[in-house]
Structure formats: structure tokens, C-alpha cells
Amino acid sequence: VLAVVETAWLFTRGTQSVRIIRAATMDGEFHLHVHGPAAARQSHVFHDVIDCMRYQADLERRLVGQGFALERFTGDRRRTPRRS
């Protein structure tokens, strides 16, 4: 699955970090990848951008409630398919 647009958020708390990456694909799916804290990894697939954004907002509220703060935002990183 090729990602068309990626947006990333980095949350930190002390030496811990959580990176959230939202990717839209050419087939209309929305992927939410959560890396951290530590070696934890999760991936979620949504067929509706609103559902994806709601899940992400809830996740961000939980992170802030646990003492994480938004460190960095990277928006609209367009990817092009690699040629073989």
C-alpha cells in the first residue's frame, strides 16, 4: 500500500517519546501508526478519515493526561512510489 500523504506528531515526556504517523493511501484507507513509548508499536487502519481523527484525538488526550507534551509536528509529507 502506497502512502500518498503522511503527517507526524512527536510527543515527549522526559526521555520517553511517542510518534504518531497518519498516512492516507491511494485506495482511500487511513493508517495510524503509533511508535512508542520504548519499543511499543501499534498500527490501525480506518476507512473513514473522521474515525481516524477521532481515534487520534482520543490517543493524544490520553498521552497529555499521562504527562506527554507535543514536541513536534510535521505536516503533509508527500511520498512518491519508488521505482524498481
Residue ranges with predicted function:
Residues 65-77:
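Short glycine-rich, low-complexity/disordered patches
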Residues 78-79, 83-84:
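N-terminal helix initiation/capping motif
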Residues 15-42, 61:
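Short aromatic-glycine-(Arg/Gly/Cys) micro-motifs in beta-strand/loop hairpins
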